[in-house]
Structures are given as structure tokens and as C-alpha cells.
Regions:
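Conserved ATPase "switch" residues in P-loop NTPase domains
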Residues: 130
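A short, well-structured catalytic beta-strand-centered motif of the EAL phosphodiesterase domain
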Residues: 2-40
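C-di-GMP signaling machinery
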Residues: 1-2, 29, 39-49, 89, ...
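Catalytic core of bacterial c-di-GMP phosphodiesterases, primarily the EAL and HD-GYP domains
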Residues: 48-121, 197
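Glycine- and small hydrophobic-enriched segments that form the cores of compact globular domains
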Residues: 19-24, 31, 40-42, 47-51, ...
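Charged helix-capping and loop-helix junction motifs
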Residues: 90-94, 121-124, 173-180
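EAL-family c-di-GMP phosphodiesterase catalytic domain
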Residues: 10-15, 24-30, 80-82, 109-116, ...
Length: 227
């Protein structure tokens, strides 16, 4: 497994303000490929998926530890169902003690399947993570899978708008208005709001015009391998 850093930009400061650590594997073509499809592939048991997700999490956190404070805030993906497995909790407590992680604002980014987890269980897991000093983000809001009800009850620290809300937003006024409404909601609730999947200057300008504070996407650069 190979950790890659994808920067998150502050649109008011013009600076890199956070990073998302993505985990890749080398496919048959020799290129680095996303692990997500493997985690959701049919035919794998829940235990096998959780074990792979834990390997990804460990890879990401160890890479952040080696980064020696390069970033103050880091996002790492987590499949919500992995929190149902006890090895996650023993692992996360151990990894949080890695050098450099204690001073970092660590955000676990719950992937779009978070709506599949029982709401009470999700809330309980989130409280336990916050007790460990870990913040919570909801990924892919607007994808049609991420439930607004679950998001509201979870009360995350960050929300990431799905790229489907960003793609061609400069040509779609209703889409731009929705991004602006979400940005206003996030500001009112003191929640960080990030638009992901920005690929063109026009999309970036539309996101800025919608008052979105943070952005991420290939327009700024591709994920880069970490040491």
C-alpha cells in the first residue's frame, strides 16, 4: 500500500491548509490505483473489508507520523462499518500515540456508506472518537447516498461536498445556489465545508462565488506519493 497526499486549499488565504491522505495499491498495469473499489467489491466478507481498511488507516497514519509536522490538519478516509470491529479501537488508540500525531488535528473522513450504519451506533462511535481527540468529517454529501438525516444527527466537524455538486457548477445556477446554501449552513453551525472534485478554473471561481471556504481537486494538483 502506498500513501498519497492530496492538498486542501483555503480559498480566502490562498494557502494549503490541510491534506487528505489517500491509500493506493499498485495494480496489474503497474499504476497506482484507488483502494475504494476493493473495499466495496462483492464477495469479500465484512471481516476482510475491515482488515483492509485498517491496513489503509495504519499506512496513512504512519505516513503522517513520518511527515514530521508538515501539516497541521490531516484527513484520512474510514469505512464506517470498520468501527464495528474491535481491532479498530485497539489500533486507533495505538496509532494516535505515534510521534507527531498528538499535535496534529486528525479528521477521520467517513465515506459515503456512513448512512448504512445504525444511527445510534454511528453516534456512539463518533463520541468515542471525539473522546480520543479525533474529529469527524462526512464525505460525499450530495452524492445521493450520504443521508442528510444521518449527517444532521452525527453533527460532524467537517462536511465535504461531493464532486457531483461541483462538476460544471459554473453552468448550473441551481447547483451553485445549493453549494452556497450548504456553505451558509456550515458557517452557521461552525462546521468546516470543503468542495472536492474541482478540475477547472471556472469551477473554482464558481465555488469561490458560492462562499465555500475550502476546496480540493485536480485543478490544484494530483495526489502525490508520500515518503
Amino acid at each position: 500500500l502506498f500513501p498519497c497526499a492530496h492538498e486542501i486549499h483555503g480559498l480566502k488565504s490562498g494557502r494549503v491548509e490541510a491534506v487528505e491522505v489517500l491509500t493506493r495499491y499498485r495494480g496489474a498495469s503497474g499504476l497506482l490505483e484507488r483502494v475504494g473499489p476493493l473495499l466495496r467489491a462483492e464477495g469479500h466478507s465484512a471481516q476482510a473489508r475491515a482488515a483492509l481498511d485498517l491496513r489503509c488507516l495504519e499506512t496513512a497514519l504512519e505516513a503522517l507520523s513520518r511527515s514530521r509536522g508538515r501539516w497541521d490538519c490531516a484527513f484520512v478516509n474510514l469505512e464506517p462499518m470498520t468501527m464495528e470491529h474491535p481491532p479498530f479501537w485497539t489500533g486507533i488508540e495505538r496509532w494516535l500515540r505515534l510521534p507527531g500525531l498528538q499535535s496534529m488535528r486528525l479528521v477521520l473522513e467517513l465515506t459515503e456508506s456512513f448512512s448504512e450504519l445504525d444511527l445510534e451506533a454511528l453516534q456512539g462511535h463518533s463520541r468515542r472518537l471525539r473522546d480520543l481527540g479525533v474529529r469527524i468529517a462526512v464525505d460525499d454529501l450530495g452524492s445521493g447516498v450520504a443521508s442528510l438525516t444521518h449527517m444532521a444527527r452525527l453533527a460532524p466537524d467537517y462536511i465535504k461536498a461531493d464532486q457531483s455538486l461541483v462538476r460544471l457548477v459554473h453552468r448550473r445556477p441551481y447547483q451553485a445556489a445549493l453549494l452556497n446554501a450548504l456553505a451558509h449552513f456550515a458557517r452557521r453551525m461552525c462546521v468546516g465545508f470543503i468542495a472536492e472534485g474541482i478540475e477547472t478554473p471556472e469551477e473554482l471561481q464558481a465555488v469561490i462565488d458560492a462562499d465555500v471556504p475550502w476546496a480540493q481537486g485536480y485543478h490544484f494538483g494530483e495526489p502525490m506519493p508520500m515518503a
